[in-house]
């Protein structure tokens, strides 16, 4: 039984008049476009992403477009995407280009799936945008053995190629 379940069983909690706070402004929007699917299985992952975790499905381009339209009315200035691993999403390049039409974008990734062809596509997307495209690369250490112990065999080599 979770804390929410315990709280709901408590009459004092159930009887609280909790006000609803409308969302009228939002500066930053985080989108979990990679769902919980990841090519790695890091020991510390806070949502246990991995190759078989489909708890939260990847966002589709249509899902992203809906959130972007909402974000415009809320005044969002910055966008972040995360997962799982965002580069497992088949629509990732279209998603990146579309988000960049709205504002600067930070991509959280382990970069192990980036090939030279994908890097060239990313460069083209950045060059066609007036907004900045940045990457936040997740690694545990500059030490290959330590990194691989946490993220999986050969993850350091794949990320640094």
Task: Describe these PLM feature segments.
Residues 1-31:
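N-terminal [4Fe-4S]-dependent radical SAM core
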Residues 22-62:
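Canonical Radical SAM [4Fe-4S] cluster-binding loop centered on the CxxxCxxC motif
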Residues 28-30, 78-80, 104-108, 132-136:
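Structural preference for beta-strand elements that scaffold enzyme active sites
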Residues 33-34, 82-83, 110:
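A secondary-structure boundary/capping signal
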Residues 42, 83-84:
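Conserved phosphate-binding and hydrolysis motifs of nucleotide-dependent enzymes
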Residues 52-66, 85-127, 135-161:
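Canonical radical SAM enzyme core domain
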